[in-house]
Protein backbone atom coordinates (compact mmCIF):
# COMPACT_ATOMS: atom_id res chain seq x y z
CA UNK A 1 0.00 0.00 0.00
CA UNK A 2 2.74 2.45 0.92
CA UNK A 3 4.64 1.68 -2.26
CA UNK A 4 1.55 2.51 -4.27
CA UNK A 5 1.10 5.67 -2.26
CA UNK A 6 4.67 6.71 -2.96
CA UNK A 7 4.18 6.16 -6.69
CA UNK A 8 1.09 8.36 -6.59
CA UNK A 9 2.71 11.12 -4.55
CA UNK A 10 3.03 13.46 -7.53
CA UNK A 11 0.64 14.75 -10.17
CA UNK A 12 1.15 14.61 -13.91
CA UNK A 13 2.70 18.07 -13.82
CA UNK A 14 5.31 16.83 -11.34
CA UNK A 15 3.88 18.73 -8.38
CA UNK A 16 3.33 16.80 -5.14
CA UNK A 17 -0.22 15.78 -4.34
CA UNK A 18 -1.30 18.16 -1.62
CA UNK A 19 -4.69 18.83 -0.08
CA UNK A 20 -6.19 21.10 2.58
CA UNK A 21 -9.24 19.94 4.53
CA UNK A 22 -11.18 22.42 6.66
CA UNK A 23 -12.78 20.60 9.61
CA UNK A 24 -15.35 22.91 11.16
CA UNK A 25 -18.20 22.92 13.66
CA UNK A 26 -19.17 24.16 17.10
CA UNK A 27 -16.80 23.88 20.07
CA UNK A 28 -17.04 20.43 21.71
CA UNK A 29 -18.68 18.95 18.59
CA UNK A 30 -16.00 16.24 18.55
CA UNK A 31 -13.78 17.71 15.83
CA UNK A 32 -10.42 16.88 17.42
CA UNK A 33 -11.42 13.28 18.15
CA UNK A 34 -12.73 12.94 14.60
CA UNK A 35 -9.55 14.47 13.14
CA UNK A 36 -7.26 12.09 15.03
CA UNK A 37 -9.30 9.05 13.99
CA UNK A 38 -9.42 10.24 10.37
CA UNK A 39 -5.66 10.84 10.23
CA UNK A 40 -4.92 7.41 11.69
CA UNK A 41 -7.24 5.68 9.21
CA UNK A 42 -5.84 7.53 6.18
CA UNK A 43 -2.27 6.68 7.16
CA UNK A 44 -3.11 3.02 7.61
CA UNK A 45 -5.53 2.49 4.71
CA UNK A 46 -4.22 4.92 2.10
CA UNK A 47 -0.56 5.26 3.09
CA UNK A 48 -0.91 9.05 3.01
CA UNK A 49 1.01 11.54 5.09
CA UNK A 50 -1.57 13.39 7.19
CA UNK A 51 -1.10 16.41 9.41
CA UNK A 52 -3.77 17.65 11.81
CA UNK A 53 -3.38 21.33 12.61
CA UNK A 54 -5.54 22.07 15.65
CA UNK A 55 -5.96 25.79 16.12
CA UNK A 56 -6.56 25.23 19.85
CA UNK A 57 -3.05 23.78 20.12
CA UNK A 58 -1.22 26.24 17.90
CA UNK A 59 -3.12 29.34 19.05
CA UNK A 60 -3.14 28.54 22.79
CA UNK A 61 -5.17 30.32 25.44
CA UNK A 62 -1.84 31.23 26.98
CA UNK A 63 -1.43 34.16 24.58
CA UNK A 64 -2.48 37.00 26.92
CA UNK A 65 -3.36 40.57 26.16
CA UNK A 66 -1.13 43.32 27.51
CA UNK A 67 -3.16 43.55 30.73
CA UNK A 68 -3.07 39.79 31.33
CA UNK A 69 -6.51 39.06 29.89
CA UNK A 70 -7.21 36.96 26.81
CA UNK A 71 -6.56 38.44 23.35
CA UNK A 72 -9.19 40.69 21.83
CA UNK A 73 -11.05 39.53 18.68
CA UNK A 74 -8.79 41.72 16.52
CA UNK A 75 -5.73 40.00 18.01
CA UNK A 76 -7.20 36.55 17.42
CA UNK A 77 -7.77 37.49 13.79
CA UNK A 78 -4.14 38.57 13.55
CA UNK A 79 -2.96 35.28 15.07
CA UNK A 80 -5.16 33.28 12.67
CA UNK A 81 -3.74 35.12 9.68
CA UNK A 82 -0.22 34.59 11.00
CA UNK A 83 -0.90 30.87 11.30
CA UNK A 84 -2.01 30.77 7.66
CA UNK A 85 1.29 32.44 6.73
CA UNK A 86 3.17 29.73 8.60
CA UNK A 87 1.11 27.10 6.81
CA UNK A 88 1.98 28.74 3.50
CA UNK A 89 5.70 28.56 4.38
CA UNK A 90 5.34 24.82 4.93
CA UNK A 91 3.40 24.31 1.69
CA UNK A 92 6.01 26.22 -0.33
CA UNK A 93 8.75 24.05 1.18
CA UNK A 94 6.88 20.86 0.26
CA UNK A 95 6.17 22.05 -3.29
CA UNK A 96 9.72 23.30 -3.91
CA UNK A 97 11.49 20.55 -1.98
CA UNK A 98 13.45 23.18 -0.07
CA UNK A 99 14.06 23.80 3.61
CA UNK A 100 11.54 25.88 5.53
CA UNK A 101 12.86 29.09 7.05
CA UNK A 102 11.34 30.88 10.01
CA UNK A 103 9.45 33.95 8.72
CA UNK A 104 10.37 37.43 9.98
CA UNK A 105 8.05 39.41 12.28
CA UNK A 106 6.56 36.25 13.74
CA UNK A 107 4.95 35.61 17.11
CA UNK A 108 7.50 33.19 18.55
CA UNK A 109 4.97 31.18 20.58
CA UNK A 110 2.75 30.59 17.55
CA UNK A 111 5.71 29.64 15.33
CA UNK A 112 7.19 27.22 17.85
CA UNK A 113 3.84 25.53 18.48
CA UNK A 114 3.30 25.26 14.72
CA UNK A 115 6.70 23.60 14.18
CA UNK A 116 6.17 21.31 17.17
CA UNK A 117 2.82 20.26 15.74
CA UNK A 118 4.45 19.28 12.43
CA UNK A 119 7.31 17.46 14.14
CA UNK A 120 4.96 15.42 16.35
CA UNK A 121 3.33 14.05 13.18
CA UNK A 122 6.60 13.18 11.43
CA UNK A 123 6.30 16.00 8.91
CA UNK A 124 9.30 18.04 10.06
CA UNK A 125 12.82 17.45 11.37
CA UNK A 126 14.62 20.01 13.49
CA UNK A 127 17.01 20.27 16.47
CA UNK A 128 15.77 20.54 20.03
CA UNK A 129 16.93 24.15 20.24
CA UNK A 130 14.70 26.00 17.78
CA UNK A 131 16.79 29.14 17.82
CA UNK A 132 19.92 27.17 16.88
CA UNK A 133 18.49 26.19 13.51
CA UNK A 134 16.66 28.90 11.49
CA UNK A 135 15.87 26.41 8.71
CA UNK A 136 13.90 23.21 9.22
CA UNK A 137 14.03 20.06 7.12
CA UNK A 138 10.96 18.29 5.84
CA UNK A 139 10.55 14.71 7.02
CA UNK A 140 10.42 12.02 4.34
CA UNK A 141 6.66 11.32 4.64
CA UNK A 142 5.91 14.97 3.83
CA UNK A 143 7.56 14.71 0.41
CA UNK A 144 7.34 11.02 -0.52
CA UNK A 145 3.58 10.49 -0.20
CA UNK A 146 0.35 12.31 -0.95
CA UNK A 147 -0.10 14.81 1.88
CA UNK A 148 -3.36 16.03 3.40
CA UNK A 149 -3.44 18.74 6.05
CA UNK A 150 -6.58 18.83 8.21
CA UNK A 151 -7.26 22.24 9.77
CA UNK A 152 -9.27 21.70 12.95
CA UNK A 153 -11.12 24.80 14.15
CA UNK A 154 -14.63 26.24 14.52
CA UNK A 155 -14.40 28.20 11.23
CA UNK A 156 -17.94 29.38 11.97
CA UNK A 157 -17.88 32.16 9.38
CA UNK A 158 -17.73 31.38 5.68
CA UNK A 159 -15.06 34.07 5.30
CA UNK A 160 -12.71 32.17 7.64
CA UNK A 161 -12.93 29.06 5.47
CA UNK A 162 -12.59 31.09 2.29
CA UNK A 163 -9.14 32.25 3.41
CA UNK A 164 -8.02 28.61 3.41
CA UNK A 165 -9.61 28.11 -0.02
CA UNK A 166 -7.66 31.10 -1.33
CA UNK A 167 -4.44 29.50 -0.10
CA UNK A 168 -5.33 26.23 -1.83
CA UNK A 169 -6.14 28.10 -5.04
CA UNK A 170 -2.89 30.08 -4.91
CA UNK A 171 -0.83 26.88 -5.04
CA UNK A 172 -3.30 24.71 -6.97
CA UNK A 173 -3.97 22.32 -4.07
CA UNK A 174 -6.86 20.02 -3.34
CA UNK A 175 -9.50 21.56 -1.07
CA UNK A 176 -12.51 20.21 0.81
CA UNK A 177 -14.63 20.92 3.87
CA UNK A 178 -16.00 18.64 6.58
CA UNK A 179 -18.67 20.14 8.83
CA UNK A 180 -19.26 18.17 12.02
CA UNK A 181 -22.92 18.72 12.88
CA UNK A 182 -23.61 18.26 16.58
CA UNK A 183 -26.69 19.37 18.59
CA UNK A 184 -26.07 22.52 20.62
CA UNK A 185 -27.20 20.79 23.83
CA UNK A 186 -24.60 18.04 23.33
CA UNK A 187 -21.84 20.60 22.73
CA UNK A 188 -22.81 22.48 25.90
CA UNK A 189 -22.79 19.27 27.93
CA UNK A 190 -19.38 18.19 26.61
CA UNK A 191 -17.98 21.67 27.09
CA UNK A 192 -19.08 21.66 30.73
CA UNK A 193 -17.06 18.50 31.29
CA UNK A 194 -13.82 20.07 30.03
CA UNK A 195 -11.08 21.25 32.35
CA UNK A 196 -11.14 24.70 30.70
CA UNK A 197 -14.71 25.15 29.42
CA UNK A 198 -15.82 28.06 27.31
CA UNK A 199 -18.70 30.19 28.64
CA UNK A 200 -22.05 28.70 27.57
CA UNK A 201 -22.98 32.09 26.12
CA UNK A 202 -20.04 31.90 23.72
CA UNK A 203 -21.12 28.54 22.31
CA UNK A 204 -24.78 29.60 22.15
CA UNK A 205 -23.85 32.77 20.25
CA UNK A 206 -21.65 30.77 17.90
CA UNK A 207 -24.53 28.34 17.37
CA UNK A 208 -26.69 31.22 16.15
CA UNK A 209 -24.00 32.69 13.92
CA UNK A 210 -22.36 29.60 12.46
CA UNK A 211 -22.53 29.37 8.67
CA UNK A 212 -22.61 25.83 7.35
CA UNK A 213 -21.06 25.09 3.94
CA UNK A 214 -23.50 26.11 1.21
CA UNK A 215 -22.40 24.65 -2.16
CA UNK A 216 -25.58 25.85 -3.87
CA UNK A 217 -24.72 29.46 -3.09
CA UNK A 218 -20.91 29.27 -3.19
CA UNK A 219 -19.29 27.31 -6.00
CA UNK A 220 -16.00 27.14 -4.09
CA UNK A 221 -17.72 25.06 -1.38
CA UNK A 222 -18.79 22.24 -3.70
CA UNK A 223 -16.30 19.80 -2.13
CA UNK A 224 -18.09 19.81 1.22
CA UNK A 225 -19.68 17.20 3.44
CA UNK A 226 -21.88 17.65 6.51
CA UNK A 227 -21.44 14.78 8.95
CA UNK A 228 -23.61 14.03 11.96
CA UNK A 229 -21.31 13.87 14.98
CA UNK A 230 -22.74 10.46 15.92
CA UNK A 231 -22.08 8.97 12.45
CA UNK A 232 -19.18 6.54 12.72
CA UNK A 233 -20.44 3.98 10.23
CA UNK A 234 -18.46 2.41 7.42
CA UNK A 235 -20.67 4.27 4.97
CA UNK A 236 -19.75 7.63 6.55
CA UNK A 237 -16.05 6.71 6.51
CA UNK A 238 -16.20 5.78 2.83
CA UNK A 239 -17.99 9.04 2.04
CA UNK A 240 -15.31 11.08 3.79
CA UNK A 241 -12.49 9.18 2.08
CA UNK A 242 -14.21 9.68 -1.27
CA UNK A 243 -14.42 13.43 -0.68
CA UNK A 244 -10.72 13.64 0.20
CA UNK A 245 -9.74 11.56 -2.83
CA UNK A 246 -11.82 13.76 -5.11
CA UNK A 247 -10.17 16.88 -3.71
CA UNK A 248 -6.67 15.42 -4.01
CA UNK A 249 -7.17 14.29 -7.60
CA UNK A 250 -8.87 17.53 -8.66
CA UNK A 251 -6.77 20.44 -7.35
CA UNK A 252 -8.12 23.95 -7.71
CA UNK A 253 -6.98 25.79 -10.79
CA UNK A 254 -4.88 28.85 -10.04
CA UNK A 255 -6.69 30.91 -12.68
CA UNK A 256 -10.47 30.93 -12.52
CA UNK A 257 -13.17 32.87 -14.26
CA UNK A 258 -12.59 36.48 -13.26
CA UNK A 259 -16.26 37.43 -13.13
CA UNK A 260 -17.12 34.55 -10.81
CA UNK A 261 -14.13 35.34 -8.61
CA UNK A 262 -15.08 38.99 -8.30
CA UNK A 263 -18.59 38.03 -7.26
CA UNK A 264 -17.31 35.54 -4.70
CA UNK A 265 -14.81 38.00 -3.28
CA UNK A 266 -17.53 40.63 -3.03
CA UNK A 267 -19.72 38.31 -0.96
CA UNK A 268 -16.83 37.42 1.31
CA UNK A 269 -16.02 41.10 1.65
CA UNK A 270 -19.55 41.80 2.87
CA UNK A 271 -19.35 38.97 5.40
CA UNK A 272 -16.18 40.37 6.93
CA UNK A 273 -17.69 43.79 7.64
CA UNK A 274 -21.31 42.78 8.35
CA UNK A 275 -20.98 42.89 12.13
CA UNK A 276 -19.25 46.29 12.18
CA UNK A 277 -21.79 47.70 9.75
CA UNK A 278 -24.69 46.48 11.90
CA UNK A 279 -23.28 48.13 15.02
CA UNK A 280 -22.48 51.41 13.26
CA UNK A 281 -25.86 51.64 11.53
CA UNK A 282 -27.67 50.98 14.82
CA UNK A 283 -25.82 53.89 16.42
CA UNK A 284 -26.53 56.10 13.41
CA UNK A 285 -30.26 55.36 13.51
CA UNK A 286 -30.38 55.98 17.28
CA UNK A 287 -28.56 59.29 16.91
CA UNK A 288 -30.89 60.37 14.08
CA UNK A 289 -33.96 59.56 16.18
CA UNK A 290 -32.61 61.60 19.10
CA UNK A 291 -32.06 64.57 16.79
CA UNK A 292 -35.58 64.16 15.41
CA UNK A 293 -37.01 64.24 18.94
CA UNK A 294 -35.02 67.39 19.68
CA UNK A 295 -36.70 68.95 16.63
CA UNK A 296 -40.04 68.14 18.31
CA UNK A 297 -41.34 66.10 15.40
CA UNK A 298 -44.83 64.74 16.26
CA UNK A 299 -44.94 61.30 17.84
CA UNK A 300 -46.80 59.74 14.92
CA UNK A 301 -44.22 61.05 12.46
CA UNK A 302 -41.41 59.82 14.71
CA UNK A 303 -42.90 56.35 14.53
CA UNK A 304 -42.99 56.41 10.72
CA UNK A 305 -39.46 57.84 10.59
CA UNK A 306 -38.16 55.03 12.79
CA UNK A 307 -39.86 52.45 10.58
CA UNK A 308 -38.30 53.90 7.43
CA UNK A 309 -34.82 54.15 8.93
CA UNK A 310 -34.93 50.62 10.29
CA UNK A 311 -36.11 49.34 6.92
CA UNK A 312 -33.24 51.17 5.22
CA UNK A 313 -30.79 49.67 7.70
CA UNK A 314 -32.21 46.19 7.13
CA UNK A 315 -31.93 46.64 3.35
CA UNK A 316 -28.27 47.67 3.62
CA UNK A 317 -27.40 44.70 5.84
CA UNK A 318 -29.25 42.31 3.56
CA UNK A 319 -27.30 43.67 0.61
CA UNK A 320 -24.10 42.98 2.49
CA UNK A 321 -25.22 39.42 3.17
CA UNK A 322 -26.29 38.74 -0.40
CA UNK A 323 -23.49 40.61 -2.13
CA UNK A 324 -25.67 42.72 -4.38
CA UNK A 325 -26.43 46.35 -5.14
CA UNK A 326 -24.43 49.48 -4.57
CA UNK A 327 -23.12 49.09 -1.05
CA UNK A 328 -20.46 46.61 -2.11
CA UNK A 329 -17.34 46.95 -4.21
CA UNK A 330 -15.45 44.39 -6.25
CA UNK A 331 -12.33 44.73 -4.12
CA UNK A 332 -11.04 42.31 -1.50
CA UNK A 333 -11.60 45.08 1.04
CA UNK A 334 -14.62 47.30 1.40
CA UNK A 335 -14.32 50.57 3.31
CA UNK A 336 -16.97 50.66 6.03
CA UNK A 337 -17.04 54.45 5.79
CA UNK A 338 -18.27 54.20 2.18
CA UNK A 339 -21.19 52.04 3.27
CA UNK A 340 -22.07 54.40 6.13
CA UNK A 341 -21.79 57.38 3.78
CA UNK A 342 -24.22 55.80 1.30
CA UNK A 343 -26.60 54.99 4.14
CA UNK A 344 -26.45 58.54 5.50
CA UNK A 345 -27.27 60.04 2.09
CA UNK A 346 -30.45 57.98 1.88
CA UNK A 347 -31.16 58.66 5.54
CA UNK A 348 -30.94 62.41 4.93
CA UNK A 349 -33.44 62.14 2.09
CA UNK A 350 -35.87 60.31 4.38
CA UNK A 351 -35.34 62.67 7.32
CA UNK A 352 -35.82 65.75 5.14
CA UNK A 353 -39.41 64.70 4.44
CA UNK A 354 -40.26 64.78 8.12
CA UNK A 355 -38.33 67.94 8.91
CA UNK A 356 -40.04 69.75 6.03
CA UNK A 357 -43.42 68.82 7.51
CA UNK A 358 -42.41 70.83 10.58
CA UNK A 359 -41.83 74.04 8.68
Curated annotation (Swiss-Prot):
Keywords carried by this UniProt record: ATP-binding, Kinase, Magnesium, Nucleotide-binding, Protein biosynthesis, Transferase
Residues bound to ATP: 25-32
EC top class named in words: transferase
Gene3D superfamilies: P-loop containing nucleotide triphosphate hydrolases
Catalytic reaction list: L-seryl-tRNA(Sec) + ATP = O-phospho-L-seryl-tRNA(Sec) + ADP
Source species, domain of life: Eukaryota
Known cofactor(s): Mg(2+)
Gene Ontology cellular component list: cytosol; mitochondrion
An example Gene Ontology biological process: selenocysteine incorporation
Pfam family for this entry, one: KTI12
Task performed by this protein: Specifically phosphorylates seryl-tRNA(Sec) to O-phosphoseryl-tRNA(Sec), an activated intermediate for selenocysteine biosynthesis. No activity with other tRNAs has been detected.
Family: Belongs to the L-seryl-tRNA(Sec) kinase family.
Protein name according to UniProt: L-seryl-tRNA(Sec) kinase
Taxonomic lineage of the native organism: Eukaryota, Metazoa, Chordata, Craniata, Vertebrata
The encoding gene: Pstk
